[in-house]
Regions:
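Short, compositionally biased P/S/T/A/G/V-rich stretches that sit at domain boundaries
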Residues: 1-8
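Conserved aromatic beta-strand anchor motif in extracellular beta-sandwich/beta-rich domains
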Residues: 24-28
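Short beta-strand segments within Ig-like beta-sandwich modules, predominantly Fibronectin type-III
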Residues: 34-40
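Surface-exposed cleft-lining segments at the edges of enzyme active sites
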Residues: 40, 143-145, 179-182, 196-234, ...
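Surface-exposed, short loops/turns at beta-strand junctions within beta-sandwich domains
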Residues: 46-53
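Catalytic nucleophile-elbow at a beta strand-turn-alpha helix junction centered on a G-D-S/GDSL motif
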Residues: 91-139, 143-147, 170, 175-179
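Substrate-gating cap/lid alpha-helix
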Residues: 259-303
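Histidine-centered active-site loop/cap adjacent to the catalytic His
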Residues: 315-347
Length: 347
């Protein structure tokens, strides 16, 4: 049996004076996990029991009556390599989501999966809004994929595509909820980069963001254009359940990370403005996934992103949801486990 790894976190703290004290906290995936109470030591060693992103913080009191000075270490990652299990049978899958789900199937280990339908750059609100019936003039875009996604978002053809291209499973991630919405031709569409470059967008179009409301009972709600976001999610789930059973639905819960690895291999934090956006969008995503689980209680959930970081040399560039390759292997392992579990239940 291997003992857990130990990590020493350099915090660059000068030794406190005789009357001073230092407390050390260990955080895993942003949550406090271990505490070393006030001591005169200037460094600390922790045992790391699980995979994840760790960092330590030192709370330094040079005088007992003073507020502590807080110093954070650089993060380190503990990770065991993931080895996907071969799935028992050829499996078809559709995606309502983003590149963070689609990129799984670029791995060599996914030969037994076939993608039937990929819907991207569409928010839940847009998907269940009224289709634009007027003829759409020529859509501009750098790629055919961009043009197809904008056309789908305008015509609201998501559910008909999913229905026509039958798949064994539907994989859902909500990364594209990061885009605001725009009022266009009497409907709501996703203000993705593709829409902004399509030739359809003009700056005078009203832009809508999800409004966070704190309720008297302490709960949280989001509204879009005066309507509860939860109602949009309920409508979305009703449409999805007319096509897939709950056991065919896999929720790929992704949170935006505050850490990335630069081209020199160093772990860094994103700039404060990026971290502020991450905090806001992660709050929205937590709410949305909670709603999805409310309406799809028997669906599967893959929730692994908290222990991983982004990489600057990602093929799509640096972004808080463009993860290290180990993340995609871990998600693929979880996906294969779900598929194999379903196969065993049927046989």
């Amino acid at each position: 049996i291997c003992s857990p790894p130990r990590a020493r976190f350099p915090l660059f703290t000068p030794p406190p004076p005789p009357s001073g004290r230092v407390a050390f906290y260990l955080f895993r995936n942003g949550e406090r996990e271990q505490i070393k109470w006030y001591t005169q030591a200037s460094e600390v060693e922790f045992e790391l029991f699980q995979d994840g992103l760790y960092h330590a913080a030192a709370f330094i009191k040079y005088k007992e009556e003073q507020q502590p000075i807080i110093i954070h270490s650089r993060p380190i990652q503990v990770l065991h390599p993931a080895v996907p299990e071969r799935i028992r049978n050829k499996t078809t899958i559709s995606i309502f989501g983003s590149c963070v789900s689609r990129d799984l199937f670029e791995l060599k280990q996914t030969d037994d999966f076939e993608i039937k339908c990929y819907i991207a750059r569409q928010s839940i609100v847009s998907a269940v809004s009224s289709p634009i019936t007027e003829p759409v003039r020529s859509i501009l875009g750098s790629t055919a994929f961009d043009r197809r996604q904008v056309f789908n978002d305008i015509k609201k053809s998501t559910f008909s595509q999913l229905r026509d291209k039958t798949a064994d499973y539907l994989l859902i991630d909500l990364v594209d909820e990061r885009f605001p919405l725009v009022k266009y031709e009497g409907s709501l569409v996703t203000m993705s980069g593709g829409f902004q470059n399509s030739g359809l967008y003009v700056p005078s179009l009203p832009i809508l963001k999800k409004q966070r409301l704190e309720l008297e009972n302490g709960g949280i709600e989001y509204n879009v254009d005066g309507k509860s976001l939860r109602d949009y999610v309920q409508s979305f789930c009703k449409e999805i359940l007319s096509i897939f059973s709950q056991k065919q639905i896999i929720l790929h819960r992704v949170r935006f990370t505050n850490y990335y690895q630069n081209r020199e291999g160093q772990l860094c934090e994103f700039e404060p403005n990026v971290k502020s956006f991450n905090f806001s969008i992660n709050q929205q995503l937590d709410y949305l996934y909670k709603c999805l689980q409310e309406f799809l209680p028997q669906s599967h959930m893959i929730d692994l992103s908290a222990g991983y970081y982004a990489v600057e040399n990602h093929k799509w560039g640096l972004a808080a949801i463009h993860f290290q390759k180990e993340y995609y292997f871990a998600v693929l392992c979880a996906l294969c486990d779900i598929v194999n579990l379903g196969y065993k239940a049927e046989h």
